[in-house]
A protein has these predicted regions:
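Membrane topogenic/interface segments and analogous intrinsically disordered interaction regions
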Residues: 1-258
Length: 258
């Protein structure tokens, strides 16, 4: 009896260690992918930062420039931006390594669900960042710059502060664009019914404006640019979730909608 228990314990320990070693290898491969992309891009770090700061530069008055208040800021800020770009480019490799680690432990129907969700999550996050860069940044910066002229003030932003603002905004909009995926997962896993999600729609709208007031600059325009897409994406998630309603509850969903 004791020998059987010790054999079972040693088997569990070996299984745990093998999974731990595999996880380490996956993390190392992901890190190497990011580093490889970063090394390829680092030569163009100043150009990448200039492209990154273009929405603000276009909103500055003629001859306006960004400033550096930290001795090392002009070096490290472009490096940080380049690392961010490298991470986004290498993210499919990172997600593949994560998928390769967890896939053996999933059932076939779970694999069929997760793969499209991973692809859609990555795509929606990138779309959210693009939405912030091409629409939100130019709109907000021009709106804020219009208030400087009557005051006789000149807008000069520190590059480190701009990086912090841009990173926060990118993260906020990237996560916001994940709303349809969250809705689909909640419905497909049976955590919340589709009828219940439709019922709480008014609270979601209020919550969208509360969240936008917390994570965006304190102006109405920025809040609208986050809250309105969040609400529309929630509606999109409800539409897509109809295709993923668990078969066992399809009858209940049909009676609830009628």
């Amino acid at each position: 009896m004791t020998e059987n228990n010790s054999t079972e314990d040693s088997g569990l320990q070996e299984s745990f260690l093998s999974h731990l070693f595999e996880l380490r290898d996956r993390v190392v491969k992901s890190a190497l992918a990011i580093i490889a992309v970063f090394v390829c891009l680092v030569y163009w770090a100043p150009d990448i930062f200039h492209l990154f700061a273009q929405p603000l530069l276009e909103a500055l008055p003629a001859g306006g420039k960004m400033i550096v208040t930290d001795v090392t800021g002009s070096f490290f800020v472009p490096m940080k931006v380049t690392m961010l770009v490298a991470f986004l480019i290498a993210l499919p490799v990172v997600m593949y390594q994560l998928w390769a680690f967890i896939a053996p432990g999933l059932y076939l129907h779970e694999r069929k669900l997760i793969l499209p969700l991973v692809i859609s999550s990555y795509s929606l996050f990138i779309i959210g960042m693009a939405f912030a860069y091409f629409l939100v940044f130019p709109t907000v910066f021009k709106f804020m710059a219009s208030y400087n002229a009557p005051l006789g003030a000149e807008m000069s932003t520190d590059i480190d502060n701009y990086l912090s603002f841009a990173m926060t905004t990118f993260l906020a909009f990237g996560i916001t664009f994940e709303v349809p995926v969250v809705v689909v997962v909640l419905v497909r896993m049976g955590i919340v019914s589709l009828a219940k999600l439709k019922e709480i729609r008014p609270y979601v709208i209020v919550g969208a404006f509360v969240i936008s007031a917390v994570v965006t600059p304190p102006d109405v325009l920025s809040q609208l640019l986050l809250a309105v897409p969040m609400t529309l994406l929630y509606e999109l998630g409800l539409l897509v979730a109809r295709l993923y309603v668990p078969k066992a509850s399809e009858g209940d969903q049909g009676s609830a909608s009628s």
